[in-house]
Amino acid sequence: MERSMYAGRVRSEHIGTTITLKGWVSRRRNLGGLIFIDLRDREGLMQLVVNPENTDAAVVETAESLRSEFVIEVTGTVEAREQANDNLPTGAVELKVEDLKVLNTAKTTPFEIKDGVEASDDTRMRYRYLDLRRPEMLENFKLRAKVTHTIRNYLDDLEFIDVETPMLTKSTPEGARDYLVPSRVSQGHFYALPQSPQITKQLLMNAGFDRYYQIVKCFRDEDLRGDRQPEFTQVDLETSFLNEQEIQDITEGLIAKVMKETKGVEVTLPFPRMSYDDAMNNYGSDKPDTRFDMLLQDLTELVKDVDFKVFAEAPAVKAIVVKGNADKYSRKSIDKLTDFAKQFGAKGLAWVKMTDGVLAGPVAKFLTSIEEKLTDALQIEENDLVLFVADTLEIANNTLGALRNQIAKELDMIDNTKFNFLWVVDWPMFEWSEEEGRYMSAHHPFTLPTEDSAAELEGDLSKVRAVAYDIVLNGYELGGGSLRINQKDLQERMLKALGFSEESAYEQFGFLLEAMDYGFPPHGGLALGLDRFVMLLAGKDNIREVIAFPKNNKASDPMTQAPSLVADKQLEELALHVELENE
């Protein structure tokens, strides 16, 4: 028989009607001579009732045989429950079973199909198809679908054109490691899976498309963490003839529309702006979480004459004040914070507490000469804990920024009902890579430098600023964009500044440079991380919760066992030979 409706949508207005439902057995129990079955489908649970006294014996026998996760088809009459269950949307009704069929049986599942499941991440991923049956997971993907639907409608209304760009493209430097795909036809040659459609979307602007968008898969072979996956989805935009403010306005409108449609939240526009330098100096992060205070304070000048070499000789001394919580931090717990700080390059962590109106702690004796000034500068009060880092400015900022976030989580200082958006602007064009021993693009090599700093491409690269902008939500980079270079000579200068010879520049990017000979318009754009956005909207802390079939922290899939070895014949066709490290 045809299904009449979803089980989770049966309501009081259906009382007295005969319906057919199909789904999974969530549980079965015998009580007071009756058999109760909870039927689950994607819309929720519905209680079924089998009364052996007035039900066909074959139906009763089938009902008795049911186990969790059996797939069934049931027909019956909707009746009012004697005692309503206010915890269920269907709690006012139940289905009096008249016919029952088992469509498929099921083994005992490795974990219970319910929210709050107690199973390891790898077990959940090994049986992802079972994990996805849980109501919480289904809701995540309904939310994701609503977000993408809203985005498409918004951009379609603004006359953006949805264009698919290639998945098999050219490997280019300046970025994370590429995923490579060997060519069978051109042996020894490789495609790369795109880290983003950056160059192709710029070429679409040269083609006159004017406004492009795509919800697109991207790939990066990088170390993983909670908000990263090797394959991810981004909302990709590019426009011609718009300035950065106009692009930001479009983005803000898109986000406001998504927030209203999916969360019922009215966000205030325009979003706040914060310079990159202010973000790093005050929050210790280029993606600051502004839902709580505890800003970084610069004490370099104040402590330069104290009798404590660690402070007096450090290039920078900065601090954060943990207000009113010093009593929660014993020496042992501060030692743990010190170990945490060392992960970010700090040599150690100095601290003092305000106890009975005076500063106490290992370094307090070195600060007596400036205690009053220090107390005033930091507004230290009773039961405050002050944490200091003395090092380079970069290490001090990064370390205290990470400590700030860690402590806020430990002390439950963050209001998780808030959605704090902001733009981080005025970015440096380059960042120094200790590993590479050279300057690298802070974003990518096609970012437009500011007009007043472009001359430094042949001088001090640390002084070059970019017409770039990142959008941040609650301490996460939601996306980033920039105006792009559209003049060939400037693009050549940019590549030269990054260490490309003329020959290597044309070998890697010749097709883009050639395109700049043919009337390339001014253009710019942005990309938003869809997975990360949905994760934050769903209140999760790992994007695996909003990706149907994600990879684990080893970039592998416990369900399909990907990546896997392949047959020698396949390798021979590709003219490849694999040597494993342990061979």
Swiss-Prot record:
<dbReference type="GO" id="GO:0006422">
    <property type="term" value="P:aspartyl-tRNA aminoacylation"/>
</dbReference>
<dbReference type="InterPro" id="IPR006195">
    <property type="entry name" value="aa-tRNA-synth_II"/>
</dbReference>
<feature type="binding site">
    <location>
        <position position="174"/>
    </location>
    <ligand>
        <name>L-aspartate</name>
    </ligand>
</feature>
<protein>
    <recommendedName>
        <fullName>Aspartate--tRNA ligase</fullName>
        <ecNumber>6.1.1.12</ecNumber>
    </recommendedName>
</protein>
<feature type="binding site">
    <location>
        <begin position="529"/>
        <end position="532"/>
    </location>
    <ligand>
        <name>ATP</name>
    </ligand>
</feature>
<feature type="binding site">
    <location>
        <position position="229"/>
    </location>
    <ligand>
        <name>ATP</name>
    </ligand>
</feature>
<dbReference type="InterPro" id="IPR002312">
    <property type="entry name" value="Asp/Asn-tRNA-synth_IIb"/>
</dbReference>
<dbReference type="GO" id="GO:0140096">
    <property type="term" value="F:catalytic activity, acting on a protein"/>
</dbReference>
<keyword id="KW-0436">Ligase</keyword>
<dbReference type="InterPro" id="IPR004365">
    <property type="entry name" value="NA-bd_OB_tRNA"/>
</dbReference>
<keyword id="KW-0030">Aminoacyl-tRNA synthetase</keyword>
<comment type="function">
    <text>Catalyzes the attachment of L-aspartate to tRNA(Asp) in a two-step reaction: L-aspartate is first activated by ATP to form Asp-AMP and then transferred to the acceptor end of tRNA(Asp).</text>
</comment>
<feature type="binding site">
    <location>
        <position position="443"/>
    </location>
    <ligand>
        <name>L-aspartate</name>
    </ligand>
</feature>
<dbReference type="InterPro" id="IPR004524">
    <property type="entry name" value="Asp-tRNA-ligase_1"/>
</dbReference>
<dbReference type="InterPro" id="IPR004364">
    <property type="entry name" value="Aa-tRNA-synt_II"/>
</dbReference>
<feature type="binding site">
    <location>
        <position position="220"/>
    </location>
    <ligand>
        <name>L-aspartate</name>
    </ligand>
</feature>
<dbReference type="InterPro" id="IPR012340">
    <property type="entry name" value="NA-bd_OB-fold"/>
</dbReference>
<comment type="subunit">
    <text>Homodimer.</text>
</comment>
<keyword id="KW-0067">ATP-binding</keyword>
<keyword id="KW-0648">Protein biosynthesis</keyword>
<feature type="region of interest" description="Aspartate">
    <location>
        <begin position="198"/>
        <end position="201"/>
    </location>
</feature>
<dbReference type="InterPro" id="IPR045864">
    <property type="entry name" value="aa-tRNA-synth_II/BPL/LPL"/>
</dbReference>
<comment type="similarity">
    <text>Belongs to the class-II aminoacyl-tRNA synthetase family. Type 1 subfamily.</text>
</comment>
<dbReference type="Pfam" id="PF01336">
    <property type="entry name" value="tRNA_anti-codon"/>
</dbReference>
<feature type="binding site">
    <location>
        <position position="484"/>
    </location>
    <ligand>
        <name>L-aspartate</name>
    </ligand>
</feature>
<feature type="binding site">
    <location>
        <begin position="220"/>
        <end position="222"/>
    </location>
    <ligand>
        <name>ATP</name>
    </ligand>
</feature>
<dbReference type="GO" id="GO:0005737">
    <property type="term" value="C:cytoplasm"/>
</dbReference>
<dbReference type="GO" id="GO:0004815">
    <property type="term" value="F:aspartate-tRNA ligase activity"/>
</dbReference>
<dbReference type="InterPro" id="IPR029351">
    <property type="entry name" value="GAD_dom"/>
</dbReference>
<dbReference type="GO" id="GO:0003676">
    <property type="term" value="F:nucleic acid binding"/>
</dbReference>
<dbReference type="GO" id="GO:0016740">
    <property type="term" value="F:transferase activity"/>
</dbReference>
<keyword id="KW-0547">Nucleotide-binding</keyword>
<keyword id="KW-0963">Cytoplasm</keyword>
<dbReference type="GO" id="GO:0005524">
    <property type="term" value="F:ATP binding"/>
</dbReference>
<dbReference type="Pfam" id="PF00152">
    <property type="entry name" value="tRNA-synt_2"/>
</dbReference>
<dbReference type="Pfam" id="PF02938">
    <property type="entry name" value="GAD"/>
</dbReference>
<dbReference type="InterPro" id="IPR047089">
    <property type="entry name" value="Asp-tRNA-ligase_1_N"/>
</dbReference>
<dbReference type="InterPro" id="IPR047090">
    <property type="entry name" value="AspRS_core"/>
</dbReference>
<feature type="binding site">
    <location>
        <position position="477"/>
    </location>
    <ligand>
        <name>ATP</name>
    </ligand>
</feature>
<dbReference type="InterPro" id="IPR004115">
    <property type="entry name" value="GAD-like_sf"/>
</dbReference>
